Amino acid sequence: MSEWNEYKLSEITTKVGSGATPRGGQESYKYDGISLIRSQNVLDFEFSGSGLAFIDNEQASQLSNVKVVEDDILLNITGDSVARVCKVPKSILPARVNQHVSIVRANLTEVIPDYLLYYLLNPQFKKYMLMIASDGATRNALTKAEIEDFDIWVPSISEQKAIA
């Protein structure tokens, strides 16, 4: 068995961040275009296309800092669906996230996305995220700083592949 090392999530990712709702809110959504991922789309282990919103190229360019790429992990960070986690499906790309969803992008030299997905969805870790999200708040929420501060135990890449 290989050695496991403890890292802060920020040390094994290249991006943690959430987006915004385009100016004009729901009225500005389009019938097709660039996918805008909202919290209702993120279920545990599963992405739901139900109610997927779309924005145009101009709106997407205003959200270029939250461009979703293949293998990104999506984490709901507010409300009753806080701490739900899934991997983005390739079929909905190109995409952006709104302010209720955070992108967690694995640093592939440190951790594989599927291992990170399973780690975040482990029942004990899920319970931990829910505890943090409800701590002293009137609304469940996880901040970027809290997410980046998550302690993640990581084995070798080969062992991660065996686990995932």
Question: Positions of the model-derived regions?
Answer:
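Non-catalytic DNA-recognition/assembly elements of restriction-modification systems
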Residues: 1-20, 149-164
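A short, polar/charged loop/turn motif at coil->beta-strand junctions and beta-hairpin connectors
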Residues: 3-6, 30-33, 49
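Sequence-specific dsDNA recognition surfaces
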Residues: 10-26, 41-70
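Short proline/glycine-enriched turn/loop segments at secondary-structure junctions
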Residues: 26-27, 92, 138-141
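Extracellular/periplasmic catalytic domains that process cell-envelope and extracellular macromolecules
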Residues: 29-30, 95
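A generic structural signal for short beta-strands and their flanking turns/coil linkers
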Residues: 33, 51, 98-100
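A short beta-sheet element
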Residues: 38, 57-121, 143
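Glycine-anchored helix-breaking recognition loops at helix->coil/strand junctions
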Residues: 39-40, 78, 97-101, 117-157
